[in-house]
């Protein structure tokens, strides 16, 4: 799927949640969909200034091995976020899992881009469904 089409689906889904009364949006800060989702929430703050972006990050050192360009985007999103939460101080084997569970445990809806039946995203979406969260998969819209 093209980034432009995905961004449109994501924006539409976020606006639908805003229209239902949602105002806090969490993102995990990973490269790819997490970053796109965070950037979309930040862009929507122009029209919906009451919404808040909460970055839930796995560890302080998450971006250490990223490219200069990816780090710059990450730092920009982090600086613009309304709140930043770290679920672990240092990188550990389970810190991504801990971050994902924190996002689900503190949410009532989950917007995802899920195309595989296995992996971290699939596990997190399964966990969200087990917690009865509203799950919106923009890969299927």
Residue ranges, per PLM feature:
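Acidic/glycine-enriched connector segments
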Residues: 1-141
